Amino acid sequence: MRKITKNQLTDLSLYCELKISKSELQQAIGEDLHNVECKKAYCIKRSDVVNAIQLYKNGAISKDALVEWVNVVWFTELFVFDDEDADSIVSVLGVLETMDEDDAIISENELSEMITALTSNTEYTPL
């Protein structure tokens, strides 16, 4: 496992905000994002997830890019969630992560409800 540098922490911040792509993050940190030792992981905030949803709603990122982002921030050691925000964040990520499945349809209204749940720090419950 490789250790992460301060410059790479900046790259994590940029990826968190979707200002760089996964491939750009891999160029900075390493191809296998699941095997990078990170003593100080980047903390994902509820506002970061809201930003990702809004970028998707506005057409700035694709569904695939959103799902890829969810998988990186949720399933690598590079990112963590603040304990008081974790339930709200995970309740939304759990739904967003399924968006690439064949029968998954998430409406604009559901995306808005996810933003509301994140903004109020409550768990999102799909209908």
What do the predicted segments below correspond to?
Residues 1-127:
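Acidic, Ser/Pro/Thr-rich low-complexity regulatory regions
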